[in-house]
A protein has these predicted regions:
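Conserved N-terminal phosphate-binding loop of PLP-dependent enzymes in the Aspartate aminotransferase
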Residues: 1-85
Length: 85
């Protein structure tokens, strides 16, 4: 589910350069550092905990027991932040 949601997010937003997924850990690589920093801060303000990596990558590491609805909500927060750019 995470891979499907992130690939859709990438196709909907041109500022995303790449998405990489390993299990439930995912990285969203943005085309520039400013965008990544803004999304990182905005997502945090909306209750989504992420990690900023290498300046232009946001890492998502949800718990293994996350429900599908919670995962969808987290990606929706990122999508909402991206729409404000």
């Amino acid at each position: 589910l995470l891979e499907k949601l992130l690939k859709k997010l990438k196709s909907d937003h041109q500022v995303i350069n790449d998405v990489r997924i390993k299990g439930l850990m995912a990285g969203i690589e943005f085309k520039n550092n400013n965008t990544a920093l803004k999304i990182y801060k905005d997502a945090s303000k909306n209750g989504l905990v992420t990690t900023l990596v290498k300046g232009n990558i946001i890492r998502i590491t949800p718990p293994l027991i996350i429900k599908n609805e919670e995962l969808k909500k987290g990606i929706a927060i990122i999508s909402s932040c991206l729409e404000q750019i």
